């Protein structure tokens, strides 16, 4: 029998749903309460498979879509985006770290599914867990469903560019991410400013609470005419069609979904080494930034991307490189792991 434990939201009618209402108001207390309620439910009903999509200390199987919180905090501190003192004083971080440790070191944990080898390595490094318990299954993409959108990018590019007031005849970079600091936009702008070739444009998509420092940096670097902030977009497909390459300069990303989405739409991808999605790139489909905090290193990767504008032939090659990651295939792998 399929069961799903949730504190909110809707699921298909064929899935039986157990709601565990959360009464606490404070975020860190909500995290603790939900974890405890899951433990209580498991102890009462003793399911054969207790699958967690997030951190719950009593899971028999868990998919680590958010990666390792400990590794995330370490990267943010290393990048000077977070204070070590806040890490230890913030009760939410302490709560998540405690649950994370209990989850990985739980003797009843049968399998953990990481979405990148990067994440698996971080967990093995930081926790007492048998590496054989961790299976890597990269994120999937709706490869088949995206086919109609991909196939008309050539004929629709000019119209899309016109609607966005962009020039379809120059090289188009694309950045998509929520929280520009963690997604590495500032170092990206530094590298972008070093390009000798100025026949390019960068479209920035995603949510950001404080846009001011990013817009100020664009102006200070003399990139006003080369960068446009489009904010959050419910449908990024027009931007994928219009762009030549996607830039993923993440400070920490277990596996940025935009990496494989862009590949499925035929875009060359430039990624930092802190994005687990880099593992699906090849020499023909992408380039890794050697040092995210060295502007010259970023500039070098961007220059290589500029030399590979999107064509019908190149886009087909790039798209076909991720056919094996079709969502249905990756989902079946997850199911198979749980039923072993």
Predicted regions: what they are:
Residues 310-339:
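A charged, aromatic-enriched C-terminal amphipathic alpha-helix characteristic of glycosyltransferases
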Residues 1-5:
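Short, small-residue-biased leader/transition segments that mark boundaries at the very start
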Residues 232, 251:
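Aromatic "clamp/platform" in nucleotide-sugar-dependent glycosyltransferases that forms part
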Residues 256-259, 277:
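Short glycine/serine-rich donor-binding loops of glycosyltransferases
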Residues 268-271:
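Short hydrophobic beta-strand element within catalytic cores of glycosyltransferases
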């Amino acid at each position: 029998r399929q069961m799903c434990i949730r504190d909110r939201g809707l699921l298909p009618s064929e899935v039986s749903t157990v709601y565990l209402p959360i009464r606490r108001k404070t975020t860190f207390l909500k995290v603790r309460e939900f974890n405890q309620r899951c433990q209580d439910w498991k102890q009462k009903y003793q399911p054969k498979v207790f699958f967690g999509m997030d951190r719950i200390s009593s899971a028999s199987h868990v998919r680590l879509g958010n990666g390792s919180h400990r590794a995330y905090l370490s990267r943010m501190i290393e990048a000077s985006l977070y204070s070590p003192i806040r890490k230890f004083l913030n009760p939410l971080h302490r709560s998540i770290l405690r649950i994370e440790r209990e989850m990985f070191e739980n003797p009843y944990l049968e399998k953990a599914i990481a979405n990148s080898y990067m994440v698996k390595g971080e967990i093995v490094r930081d926790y007492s867990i048998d590496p054989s318990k961790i299976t890597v299954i990269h994120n999937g993409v709706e490869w088949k469903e995206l086919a109609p959108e991909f196939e008309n990018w050539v004929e629709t590019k000019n119209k899309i560019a016109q609607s966005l007031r962009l020039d379809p005849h120059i090289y188009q970079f694309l950045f998509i991410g929520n929280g520009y600091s963690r997604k590495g936009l500032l170092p990206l702008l530094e590298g972008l400013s070093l390009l000798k070739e100025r026949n390019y444009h960068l479209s920035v998509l995603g949510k950001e609470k404080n846009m001011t420092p990013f817009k100020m940096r664009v102006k200070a670097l003399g990139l006003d005419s080369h960068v446009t902030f489009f904010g959050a977009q419910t449908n990024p497909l027009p931007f994928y069609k219009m762009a030549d390459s996607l830039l993923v300069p993440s400070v920490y990303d277990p596996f940025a979904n935009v990496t494989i989405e862009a590949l499925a739409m035929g875009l060359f991808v430039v990624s930092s080494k802190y994005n687990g999605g880099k593992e699906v790139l090849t020499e023909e489909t992408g380039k890794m930034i050697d040092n995210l905090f060295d502007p010259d290193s970023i500039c070098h990767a961007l220059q290589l991307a500029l030399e590979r504008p999107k064509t019908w032939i190149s886009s087909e090659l790039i798209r076909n490189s991720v056919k094996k990651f079709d969502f249905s295939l990756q989902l079946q792998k997850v199911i198979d792991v749980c039923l072993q």
